[in-house]
From Swiss-Prot:
A molecular function GO annotation: acyl-phosphate glycerol-3-phosphate acyltransferase activity
Source organism: Trichlorobacter lovleyi (strain ATCC BAA-1151 / DSM 17278 / SZ)
Pathway in which the depicted protein is active: Lipid metabolism; phospholipid metabolism
UniProt key word Lipid metabolism: yes
Matches recorded under HAMAP family: PlsY
Catalysed reactions listed for this entry: an acyl phosphate + sn-glycerol 3-phosphate = a 1-acyl-sn-glycero-3-phosphate + phosphate
GO biological process: phospholipid biosynthetic process
UniProt subcellular location: Cell inner membrane
Keyword Transferase recorded: yes
Record protein name field: Glycerol-3-phosphate acyltransferase
Lineage of the organism: Bacteria, Pseudomonadati, Thermodesulfobacteriota, Desulfuromonadia, Geobacterales
Domain of life: Bacteria
Length: 194
């Protein structure tokens, strides 16, 4: 039990590292005051540039991927891996270094699920790519990919703990997109430009 709490706390602290904020500051920009104000890859892409956006995406994804892979490598079963992944995700969204504020969690969730359920990621990624290709809204693709992920996990042979973690992650991702949802409804959401 103590080892499990250690892993969960460590994953949370790793997830709490604000990748986008730190990369933005390297370029003299506080992304919380630019664009959407979000510290995630999409805002970095739009306000700082493509390279920094991709670096942010990679860093945020690794924050979810690495602790889960390490827990797996050290012999922890899927239920503990799921809690470790949830902790890393919560660290990103509710960062201890940002007074429990943070990003929307999409890239970190991607990393978590690449480690825990890579086949399920393919299904969610297909939904994301299709919606972004047709409507050009990153937020819509992210919201719908999050929404389908628990359904995919439900129909795959995974532990109940992973399903619970997936439902919680999906719910938080969708809730964190509340302002995007309002803009989508109003027709004022920014479209993705490659």
């Amino acid at each position: 039990m103590t080892a499990g709490l250690f892993w969960i706390a460590g994953a949370y602290l790793l997830g709490s590292i604000p990748t986008g904020l730190l990369l933005g500051k390297l370029y003299g920009i506080d992304v919380r005051n630019e664009g959407s104000g979000n510290i995630g890859a999409t805002n970095l892409y739009r306000t700082v540039g493509r390279k920094v956006g991709i670096l942010t995406l990679t860093g945020d994804c690794l924050k979810g991927l690495l602790p889960v892979l390490l827990a797996w490598k050290l012999g922890h079963a899927e239920p503990m891996q799921a809690w470790v992944g949830l902790a890393a995700f919560c660290g990103h969204v509710f960062s201890v270094f940002l007074l429990f504020k943070g990003g929307k969690g999409v890239a970190t969730a991607l990393g978590v699920f690449l480690a825990l359920a890579p086949l399920a990621v393919l299904g969610a990624l297909a939904v994301f790519i299709l919606l972004v290709a047709v409507w050009r809204y990153i937020s819509l693709g992210s919201i719908m990919a999050a929404a389908v992920m628990p359904l995919i996990i439900f129909f795959r042979p995974h532990s109940p703990q992973l399903l619970i973690a997936t439902v919680l992650i999906a719910a938080v991702v969708i809730i964190k997109h509340h302002s995007n949802i309002s803009r989508l409804i109003a027709g004022t959401e920014s479209k993705f430009k490659a």
